[in-house]
From Swiss-Prot:
GO terms for cellular component: cell periphery; membrane; plasma membrane. It is a multi-pass membrane protein. Keywords: Ammonia transport, Cell membrane, Membrane, Transmembrane, Transmembrane helix, Transport. PANTHER family: LOW AFFINITY AMMONIUM TRANSPORTER (PTHR42718:SF1), MAJOR FACILITATOR SUPERFAMILY MULTIDRUG TRANSPORTER MFSC (PTHR42718). Low affinity ammonium transporter of the plasma membrane. May be involved in drug resistance through pumping them out of the cell. Its main location: membrane. Belongs to the major facilitator superfamily. It comes from Saccharomyces cerevisiae (strain ATCC 204508 / S288c). GO terms for biological process: ammonium transmembrane transport. It is found in: Cell membrane. This is Low affinity ammonium transporter. One of its GO terms (molecular function) is ammonium channel activity.
C-alpha cells in the first residue's frame, strides 16, 4: 500500500513539474514586443510584415495567369498537369504552417520570418531556371517555393500580435494584413502576365526572387530585436518541444493524401500508386492523431479543440476549396473559352484589389457590431453567389455582366471569412492556445485550395470527353465548387443558430438568477 502511494505521489510531482515547465513555455508567448518608436519606422515595419501576405498570394497569381504560356514551354497542355503549378504551391503553404509557427515560438519569430523570405527567394529563382529543365522540376520548385510563405505567415502574425495591444491600432494593422491578399494576387497575376506575354515567363520568378531577397534584408533591419525565448535543455528535450514525431507523420500524411488527390486526374485513379498513396497518407494521419493525443507539447493540441472549432474549420475548408476551384477555372474559362490573353484576363481581375480592400474595412466594422458567426454566413454566401455567377455565364456574354460581378463578389468571401474564423477560434480556445487560431485557419485555407483543385480535376477529367469538351469540364468543376460553398452555408447557418440559442439560454439563465 505504501509503495502504491509513493508511486502515485511521484506521478503527481512529475505532472506538476511538467505543468510548471509548460506554463513557463507558454508565458514566453505572451511577452509584449517593443513597438517601433517613429511613424516612419512603424510604417516600414507594418509594410514588411504585410508583404508576407501580399507575396504569398502573388506566388499563387504568378502561376495562374500565364498558366498556358508556362505549360507550352514544357509541352504540357493537360489540365491536370497544369493544375499542379498552383496546387503544389498551396500544398506546402498549408502543410508547413503549424510547424513553422512552432519553430518561431521556440527559436524566435523574427529569425524565421527573415529565413522564410530567403527561402522564398531561392526557390523562386530556381523556378525560373527550371525553364531549362522540365515540368517535374518546375512543380518541385513550386512546392519548395510554398514553404517560404508557410514560414512567413504565422511568424508575421505572431510578431504583429506580440507588438500591438488590443485596440483600434491593432485592428487597423490586422485589417491591412488581410487586405494585402487580393492586391497581392492581382500584382502577381499582372506582372507574370506582362512578362510572360511580352518578354519571357521566367523573369516573373527571377524578379520575385530578387524582391523576396530585398524584403528579407529589410525585415532584418526594420523588425525590432526581440529577446530569444529561453530554452532550458535540462528541463525538457528540444525535439519533444518541437514535437518531432508529430511533425514528421503529419507532414508525410498531408503531402501523400494531397498528392494522391491531385495526381489522380493526371494519371487516372485506376493507376495503383494513386490510391495506394491515398491509403498510406490516411494511415500516417491516423498515426499523427495518435501521437498528438499523447505528446507533451503537441503540434495540434486536441484538448484545445471543440465542436465550435470543428464548425469553423469546416466552413473555412468548404469555402476556400470552392474559391480555389473558382479562381483556377475562371482563368481557364477566360483564356481558353473566350480566347483572351493573360494580360487582358489580369486586367479584368483588377477589381479584386479594390473589392478586397472594401471587404476588409467593412468586415472590421461588422465584427464590432455583428457576431462573427453571422459574418461567416455572409462570407459563405459570397463564395456561393460568386461561383454560381461564373458557372452560368455564357461564353460570348459581355464581361460586365456576370463575370465582373463574380469577380467583385468573391473577395468578400475571402476577406470576411478569414478574420471571422480567426476571432471565432480565438473565442473558443483557451488563452494559452491563442496563437494556434490564426495558424489553423491559414493551414486549412491553403490546404483546402490544393485539395479542392484535386477534387475538381477528377470531376473535370471524367466529363470533358478526353479534353474534347473543356467547357463542360469547367462548368462541372464549378458545380462542385457551388456544392462545397453551399455546404459551407449550411454549416455556417447551423453554427449561427447554435450560437444564437446558446446566447439566448445564457440571457434567460442570468435573468432567472437575478429574479
Amino acid at each position: 500500500m505504501s509503495t502504491s502511494s509513493s508511486v502515485t505521489q511521484k506521478n503527481l510531482d512529475t505532472n506538476a513539474e511538467a505543468l510548471k515547465k509548460e506554463d513557463k513555455v507558454l508565458s514566453e508567448f505572451d511577452i509584449q514586443d517593443e513597438r517601433p518608436k517613429s511613424l516612419l519606422w512603424e510604417s516600414a515595419f507594418v509594410g514588411v510584415l504585410c508583404s508576407a501576405q501580399l507575396m504569398t498570394q502573388a506566388g499563387l497569381g504568378q502561376s495562374l495567369a500565364p498558366l498556358h504560356i508556362i505549360g507550352n514551354s514544357f509541352g504540357t497542355t493537360n489540365a491536370g498537369q497544369l493544375s499542379w503549378f498552383a496546387s503544389a504551391y498551396s500544398l506546402t503553404v498549408g502543410t508547413f504552417i503549424l510547424i513553422a509557427g512552432r519553430l518561431g515560438d521556440i527559436f524566435g519569430h523574427k529569425k524565421f520570418f527573415v529565413l522564410g523570405f530567403f527561402w522564398y527567394a531561392l526557390w523562386s529563382l530556381l523556378a525560373g531556371f527550371s525553364v531549362y529543365s522540365n515540368q517535374i522540376f518546375f512543380d518541385c520548385c513550386r512546392a519548395f517555393q510554398g514553404m517560404g510563405p508557410a514560414f512567413l505567415l504565422p511568424n508575421a502574425i505572431a510578431i504583429l500580435g506580440r507588438t500591438y495591444k488590443p485596440g483600434r491600432r491593432k485592428n487597423m494593422v490586422f485589417s491591412l494584413f488581410g487586405a494585402s491578399a487580393p492586391g497581392g494576387f492581382f500584382l502577381g497575376a499582372v506582372f507574370s502576365s506582362m512578362l510572360g506575354q511580352l518578354a519571357w515567363w521566367p523573369w516573373a520568378y527571377w524578379i520575385m526572387g530578387i524582391a523576396c531577397f530585398v524584403l528579407a534584408v529589410a525585415g532584418y533591419f526594420v523588425i525590432p530585436h526581440t529577446p530569444m525565448p529561453s530554452r532550458d535543455a535540462s528541463s525538457f528535450k528540444l525535439l519533444e518541444r518541437i514535437d518531432f514525431a508529430g511533425s514528421v507523420t503529419g507532414v508525410v500524411g498531408l503531402i501523400l493524401f494531397n498528392f494522391a488527390w491531385n495526381q489522380g486526374p493526371v494519371v487516372g485513379w485506376q493507376t495503383p500508386y494513386t490510391y495506394a498513396l491515398l491509403i498510406v497518407g490516411t494511415f500516417f494521419l491516423v498515426i499523427f492523431a495518435y501521437i498528438e493525443s499523447r505528446a507533451a507539447f503537441p503540434l495540434l493540441p486536441f484538448a484545445a479543440l471543440s465542436s465550435d472549432t470543428a464548425f469553423v474549420l469546416s466552413c473555412i475548408a468548404a469555402g476556400w476549396a470552392s474559391f480555389g476551384i473558382w479562381i483556377f477555372y475562371t482563368w481557364q474559362f477566360m483564356e481558353d473559352s473566350r480566347g483572351q490573353t493573360p494580360l487582358l484576363s489580369s486586367a479584368q481581375f483588377s477589381p479584386v484589389a479594390i473589392s478586397g480592400f472594401c471587404a476588409a474595412v467593412t468586415t472590421g466594422f461588422l465584427l464590432s457590431h455583428t457576431p462573427p458567426s453571422t459574418v461567416m454566413l455572409f462570407a459563405m454566401t459570397a463564395f456561393t453567389v460568386g461561383t454560381i455567377l461564373i458557372a452560368t455565364a455564357p461564353v460570348h456574354q459581355t464581361y460586365w455582366a456576370q463575370t465582373f460581378v463574380s469577380i467583385i463578389v468573391m473577395p468578400w468571401g475571402m476577406d470576411m471569412s478569414f478574420p471571422a474564423a480567426t476571432i471565432m477560434l480565438s473565442d473558443s480556445m483557451p488563452h494559452e492556445h491563442q496563437g494556434l487560431a490564426a495558424s489553423l485557419v491559414n493551414t486549412v485555407v491553403n490546404y483546402s485550395i490544393s485539395i479542392g483543385l484535386g477534387i475538381a480535376g477528377t470531376i473535370e477529367s471524367r466529363v470533358n470527353d478526353g479534353g474534347a469538351k473543356p467547357l463542360k469540364g469547367y462548368r462541372c468543376s464549378w458545380y462542385m465548387g457551388i456544392g462545397l460553398s453551399g455546404l459551407g452555408i449550411f454549416v455556417a447557418a447551423t453554427y449561427a443558430w447554435s450560437t444564437f440559442m446558446k446566447s439566448k439560454k445564457r440571457i434567460s439563465e442570468k435573468q432567472h438568477f437575478i429574479e
